């Protein structure tokens, strides 16, 4: 599952940027579909990953890493960013679903949506980067 999440993030970041591009092109329905699918996939992958980490753990797989002494600190940085991003992502989706009308078009919620969307985008990219760094330090650089 860990490898799946690492690879999924390689595809998630470009899909995120592609989906944002659809909103900028005023293709709001396509933007909504892409973002809802991406959000569902990410949340499902993270939940499955967390279940596996609780059942199997990761420390025994990383004991031979030359970075063993700093892995916990690196992981905490990643966790803080990823939890904050998850909260932002859920807020972005929930507010968008509640506030935007059908058919989709810009409205009074658009300014807030752009701001929280930018924070979510930055968080998702940082989550991916810190996750990749941790993955490499813990499991690849042995």
Language model features with spans:
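Alpha-helical membrane insertion/targeting regions
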Residues: 1-142
């Amino acid at each position: 599952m860990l490898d799946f999440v690492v690879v999924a993030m390689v595809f998630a970041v470009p899909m995120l940027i592609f989906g944002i591009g659809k909103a900028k092109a005023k293709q709001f329905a396509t933007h909504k579909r892409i973002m809802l699918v991406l959000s569902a996939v990410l949340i499902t992958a993270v939940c499955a990953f967390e279940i596996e980490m609780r059942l199997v753990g990761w420390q025994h797989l990383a004991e031979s890493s030359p970075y063993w002494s700093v892995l916990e600190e690196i992981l905490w940085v990643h966790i803080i960013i990823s939890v904050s991003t998850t909260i932002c992502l859920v807020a972005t989706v929930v507010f968008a679903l509640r506030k935007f009308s059908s058919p989709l078009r810009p409205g009074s919620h658009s300014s807030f949506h752009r701001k929280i969307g930018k924070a979510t985008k930055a968080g998702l990219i940082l989550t991916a980067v810190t996750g990749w760094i941790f993955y490499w330090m813990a499991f690849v650089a042995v």
